[in-house]
């Protein structure tokens, strides 16, 4: 058996605080330092301040996101409601009864809360008290941001990072790119050769973090972007990442969770009736949806398939259907 965590861990297990599990599966260590993943500067830039009551809707189960984003909020003297992935009704009730001022989660879930709140007859600007939102884990449009800011009367800013390295970049008030975090050294490289590209050229984000516990040097994230070194009106001198324009590989990201092709193949391989399959990812109304299209002459095990999907793909929701005649699966 090989060494734990690929031999990249430099400390004894007793010096760690936690070890998490991310989709892949990938194991992510956390040492005992404060704000191990380095998100404090991003939350401050987004507008979170001492005295805010913040509802954190990222999962606290196995994956690191919940605690990853709670620690920096505590550094800023914010109180945190560890709501996790609780159902929409409870989330809205908590927001209203506790007069929550900050939201942390995916943009699609905030949109879902807005839609459900309006269905319940809530005036989101008057019945809720949200002032600031920090979102990550998904791409979203400026139209969606503007819509949510108007619905709730709040400021919404985004951050970018991974479970492996933590914070890589974040938006400031001017929202003209992602300031590269102080803890990160970022290169934009050719996806095939790993050779750094010139500023402004689109390539793969490759990051090195100054972490003495878990050595990750020139980690290729699989995301595509570019570097912008033009001065920012906010006064920060760090270069900025442009928009994330795509992925290098065929990995899909659904509601902040990665789904890898080999995970799907492991689930599908159990069902001999399925001849071909295809994953379809859409974002109607700003909310991620995934469909699993299957080709089978006769298939009556949809419930079993979806159950195995939920187990094999870490709870990422999907619906299964057969494609229309003539449509490739």
Placement of each model-derived feature along the sequence:
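Nucleotide 5′-phosphate-binding alpha/beta core
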Residues: 1-45, 49-50, 193, 286-293, ...
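Conserved AMP-binding loop of ANL adenylate-forming enzymes
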Residues: 40, 44-78
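Short secondary-structure capping/junction motifs at helix and strand boundaries
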Residues: 29-30, 47-53, 79-83, 157
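Short secondary-structure boundary/capping elements
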Residues: 14, 34-38, 61-65, 83-87
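Active-site glycine/GP-rich loop and adjacent strand/helix microenvironment
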Residues: 76-329
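Acidic/glycine-enriched edge-of-secondary-structure segments
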Residues: 21-34, 70-79, 100-107
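Conserved beta-strand segments that form the floor/walls of ligand-binding pockets within enzyme
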Residues: 21, 55, 134
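Short, conserved acidic/polar surface loops in the N-terminal third of protein domains
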Residues: 31-34, 44-48, 65-68, 93, ...
